[in-house]
């Protein structure tokens, strides 16, 4: 059987080391068990089974992240250290519980602080986010996983993260039951396991792809500034 050769061969070194950063926006502090953190750990374990990686799980509730849009908003601000981790990561997992049908306040704070990188891109045409792969992890004891997933995906896409197919894993427990009582169900849930495995496979594949074939920014500064000007223009 005749097989055509790809016009542009895609050489992806299988042993390319990857940095994977998981940002847990649970409102619980250490040492309390975080359901979101447990699912993030499951995804990270799947990633480690696939590739040579360095993984780190950061619990945002244990950091000091003041309100604001700059790189440093107070004398005590952990954002500069956190943004360094984000810049050196190949894959960033955005992990949040569902609170009142939406993402947690800490996930919203993270998104707001990331605006500093978006503004840097607008001003300089150089992006610290382009070429990075994003994944999403969600847990909760109420409905809303798909809504939260979609809203986060929209933000990350506009910021410049690459979102592979099936790049999210979630688990939603029985309404009215504390998620701590559902722990064993969560850890055995086949659909959640399938999503975690698919998420890991896809973020690793696309991270390797972009490492081997980095994106080229096309008129980054002008394009981004033009987009901002369009969004700021009064509606007719």
Residue ranges and their predicted role:
Residues 1-124, 186-236:
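N-terminal beta1-alpha1-beta2 submodule of the flavodoxin-like/Rossmannoid cofactor-binding fold
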Residues 175-177:
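Long, compositionally biased intrinsically disordered regions
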Residues 135, 179-191:
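Juxtamembrane/interfacial segments around transmembrane helices
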Residues 125-173, 191-194:
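Short, glycine-/small-residue-rich phosphate/pyrophosphate-handling segment
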